Structures are given as structure tokens and as C-alpha cells.
């Protein structure tokens, strides 16, 4: 069974509580449970990880080397700041797709730049929690 890793960055543990008018009212746990069920139905294993700190995310990416076939990542605020996470993704050379709940291009100007978009397989943004479903579908299609 192939493994897909769902990585979520800072403050995403607050989904459902934090600015629901921007991020929706679903919790991260609800999203993860739904995606795990979808993955299992199609014969894939989905592992989920969320951290508020850059070091923990980098360490999890390093641990993925040789064990994970595809990464779905919502780097959250690290999208616009983390060269270190970018370098970790390049180091492990695991294909990945970038996901954002909100449309980062229509928000504050400091959110318009992503350190990941040019090295990702694609970007899904602005589609709310459904964006994760589309990302999982893409990951599975890529692995078939």
C-alpha cells in the first residue's frame, strides 16, 4: 500500500475556531478523518501531521524519505517565509502538492508569494476544505 502524507502548518490546529469566515467551520480532525476514509477506499494509506513549529515540520519531511510516496502540504504562514521547509522538500525529492484553504492571491500582499509553488506539482487555493479532497485525488492519480 502506498503512503501519502498530509502536512499542515501553524495554526491549522485551530480550524473551526479561527476566522471561520476565511477558513470555514470544519476542524482539522474532521478533514483528516474524511480524507483517510477516501484514501483507504482507494487502497492508499494517509498519514497526517500538523505542527506549529518549523523544526517539527522539517523533521517530519526528513522522516518521510523512503517511506512516503506523495506529500500534500498546507504550509500555512510558512508558505511566505520558510526557505528551510522548501529545502527539506527538495532534499527528500518526494512529489508534493501545495494546498491553501483561502485564496492567498486575493489576500494581503505579503501572502501572495509562496516559497513552494515553483517546486510543487501544483497549487490548490481558495476552495476551502474541499481543496484537500482535490489534492488527495491528484496525489492518488499521480501514484497510479
Swiss-Prot record:
Pathway: Metabolic intermediate biosynthesis; chorismate biosynthesis; chorismate from D-erythrose 4-phosphate and phosphoenolpyruvate: step 3/7. Keywords: Amino-acid biosynthesis, Aromatic amino acid biosynthesis, Lyase. GO terms for molecular function: 3-dehydroquinate dehydratase activity. It comes from the Bacteria. Its EC number is 4.2.1.10. The keyword Transit peptide does not apply. Coiled coil: none annotated. Pfam families: DHquinase_II. GO terms for biological process: amino acid biosynthetic process; aromatic amino acid family biosynthetic process; chorismate biosynthetic process; quinate catabolic process. Substrate binds at residues 74, 80, 87, 101-102, 111. The active site is at residues 23, 100. The record marks 18 as: Transition state stabilizer. It catalyses: 3-dehydroquinate = 3-dehydroshikimate + H2O. PANTHER family: CATABOLIC 3-DEHYDROQUINASE (PTHR21272:SF3). Belongs to the type-II 3-dehydroquinase family. Catalyzes a trans-dehydration via an enolate intermediate. Homododecamer. This is 3-dehydroquinate dehydratase.
